[in-house]
Amino acid sequence: MANLVESQRLFQTALSLMPGGVNSPVRGWGAVGLTPPPLLVRGAGARVYDVDGNSYVDFIGSWGPLILGHAAPEVVAAVQETAARGLGFGASTPGEVDLAKLLVEAVPSLEMVRLVTSGTEACMSALRLARGASGRPRLIKFDGCYHGHADSFLVSAGSGVLTQGIPGSPGVPHEIAALTLSLPYNDLKAVKEAVRRHPGEIAAVIVEPVAGNMGVVLPKPGFLEGLRQLCHQEDIILIFDEVITGFRVAWGGAQALYGVTPDLTCLGKIIGGGLPVGAYGGRRDLMSQMAPAGPIYQAGTLSGNPVAVAAGLATLKALQKPGTYEQLEEKGAWLAQELARAAARQHLDLTVNRLGSLLTPFFTRGPVHDLEDARRADLQKFRQFFQGMLAAGI
């Protein structure tokens, strides 16, 4: 294991200043049995460096935004140039128009878009819009999927809620949690039954078109198409949370790859190039109901921040270069193949779920289609794998 003396010292100080010593639960690394986590000070390309001078090959990429790697020259240059002209104005800027135009052109469902500062904000705003436009209260989501930490989403959620083993939704009033119906991912029959039991009450169905927060779980053939058909029939607003998949699995996101167009889409991570940007958008008749054009309110002091927008634009323009997604597919396929080969050599049960450059190794036998399948994976083996990789500088 690498020398982490300075990381240990700083983490002990952090524990007295911040809950769990971190500003986001997944950074604590408690679920993988590692304390302290390395405190990082620098990144370049595929590598990151900690305060103790250790170097690691990084497969996290700031949890998704850094698809070009750390300190990508074109992104750094765009940020520096924009920051030199001002960090923010509290007024609209040309970059916001450029980013909105690029997003609308790229993502099939987007006719209009609103920039915000995080994926959480995008999802909570899209839900408010769906409820306001439909006049209905209830939400359908899926077990193990994570849509940020807004109250309505913290029911059978994924991401840190899942890995930290947090039960239910403490701090969320029962009356709010009761409006969220959480169903098994990939179970279209369960969705139809929930709609039947609550006629005229479901405002929206929100789904990660490729689940990423319980590990990567792909939609079964017909699942997304079935959701689209059902929502159309029942006048329910279908929301794709593409915070992870947007511009990761394909230029237009998972909806472009699968050919299924939702009513609203939530974006984040990659569209900010490593800085805080989120977005939600979709049908013009829905988005036109947002203030100031309509009565449904949402606002943000730093929404469309020029420096963050510049980072996002630079990242997306780089992704437009020919061959980018083919290269990501090639690298993802190679990594999945090598993981499977290594597991076979050690006689380990391993299922690798992958789409493009998104992948998860589950230490289990058989397919992983939902949260219950994911929970059957051997967590202790994953901890050993994680710790061994870190010791090897990965």
Outline where the language-model segments fall:
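Conserved N-terminal phosphate-binding loop of PLP-dependent enzymes in the Aspartate aminotransferase
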Residues: 1-394
